[in-house]
Amino acid sequence: MFRCVVRFGAKDIRFGTEARQSMLKGVQRAVEAVATTLGPKGRNVIIEQSYGAPKITKDGVTVAKSIEFKDPFENMGAQLVRQVCNKTNDLAGDGTTTSAVLVASIFSEGIKSIATGTNPIDMKRGMDRAVEVILKNIESQSRTVTNTENVVQVATISANGDVELGKLIGEAMEKVGKDGVITTQDGKTLTTELEVVEGMSVDRGYISPYFVTDAKTQKAELEDAFVLVSAKKLNNIHTILPVLNHVVRSGRPLLIIADDVESEALTTMIFNKLQGKLKIACVKAPGFGDNKAAMLQDIAIFSGACVVGEEGSGVELDAEKFEASILGSVKKATITKDDTVLLNGGGDVAMMKERVDLVRGLIERETSDYNREKLQERLAKLSGGVAVIRVGGASEVEVNEKKDRITDALCSTRAAVQEGIVPGGGPALLRASKALDGLLQDQSLTADQRTGVQIIRNAVRLPAHRIVANAGREGAVVVEKVLENTDAAVGYDAQLDRYVNMFEAGIIDPARVVRVALTDAASVASLMMTAEAAVVDLPKDDAPAAGGMGGMGGMGGMDGMY
């Protein structure tokens, strides 16, 4: 009989003020590195990598991800900064540096107040009230994106003031539409170029991260790939062995889009992929019910495949018999954890046109708003094409840095189209801070809640302050001058060192980026403030391993035992 013994490593625990101060140290050090990138005059950060040349970036989330401290409590603080940056990046695609600056300010002021006797729970209630007021004010300041010029302005700001990149992104969005797919690839020249290719997107990513081919970008990329489309779950490896054998013999990759892939089939595919015997990725079919069946048919027509297991189709996977004609093909498939982009499908052009016309007809006849919206999404994916930005540069370092900025700019642009724009460079939060003056006078607030409101009021003024400081000017003076101006659109242009109407000057931010940066920062900082203990692993002693046991009489050694 075997017995399993699990031993946990020794822990170090700190409580109260000591725990919070230790984490604060890590937060402040991490945020100082991230904050140097804020604004048009922000500086680059050079990051050592485990392989290749150092990475040069002005992207806040990239800097945050690279930071790790030797002290485990400081590292805990840095990890929380990384968490808020990642969350903001996932939800808004930009604003990570702003959220880092906010979280450091809220956490720092919060623990100072707690040390003087402020009730942390009441203080958090005050902070929550203040955040609500500011979000309403941000919403009232926002304007709808009405033209390509606004798109170019947002993209230019997020691309660190690069007008050419801003124009390129504006052109890409104009060609494929606001719901269209825009991707980046390494170019083969010194210039960055735009190309619109025939393609479609699928709102599902890889089933398992083991299918990733690029650990750095966490993407699976398959060139000149076969496509297998299945309306049924694939769980028996024997039924798809003929497909896998055909793919291995051809030397080409395989993309499987199926209702699901599980158990034995998934395990076998992952094992062979990791062994280098098979280039493969599996994606779960998008949509639900009838919509799922229709989208699988869209993918099949685009790629030239047959839908396996579709009711009435007569096409099934058979362990004894396999026809290569059931497989489709794409020139390239790029799969992330959230979505899949297919380029240059092998389907018949005439059938694709018929399919697009069919979906257009369904949209005209559809009476349900929900169903019409889903049909419009399908039409955009079928007919919109894919804009590919081929990023050029003199070196790999330059190309990667430019790709980071383009990714930020694309996310910001989509956010702006969806939720509108506000004055950029910090004045939106600055103006919103004045809306808290009325809340501070609210007699229903306790003294501790009022402290929470004041903490948020001070914090939301800091991003503008830091942008000005990075430009070499006195932050407090500029911030005060902006607040004195009665025109809500007026702010400070750090690039040209002057006060301008931010909308007219094209210095704008997506309202969603500002909203998400504040809510994420306030959420994480308030959780850190109310923590009363911090637990970390103690470093393990590097004691030498004990020598192996000699064999007993009549027995060999124990080297073969595992």
Swiss-Prot record:
UniProt cross-references to Gene3D superfamilies, sorted A to Z: GroEL, GroEL-like equatorial domain, TCP-1-like chaperonin intermediate domain
A Pfam family the protein falls into: Cpn60_TCP1
Bridged cysteine pairs (disulfide): none
Coiled coil: none
Cellular component GO terms, alphabetical: cilium; cytoplasm; mitochondrial matrix; mitochondrion
PROSITE patterns attached to this UniProt entry: CHAPERONINS_CPN60 (PS00296)
CDD domains: GroEL
GO biological process, one term: protein folding
Transit peptide per record: 1-8
Organism superkingdom: Eukaryota
GO molecular function: ATP binding; ATP-dependent protein folding chaperone; unfolded protein binding
Statement: the UniProt record of this protein carries the keyword Chaperone: yes
Function of the protein: Implicated in mitochondrial protein import and macromolecular assembly. May facilitate the correct folding of imported proteins. May also prevent misfolding and promote the refolding and proper assembly of unfolded polypeptides generated under stress conditions in the mitochondrial matrix.
NCBIfam families noted in UniProt: GroEL, PRK00013.1, PRK12849.1, PRK12850.1, PRK12851.1
Annotated protein name in UniProt: Chaperonin HSP60, mitochondrial
Organism: Trypanosoma brucei brucei
Name of encoding gene: HSP60
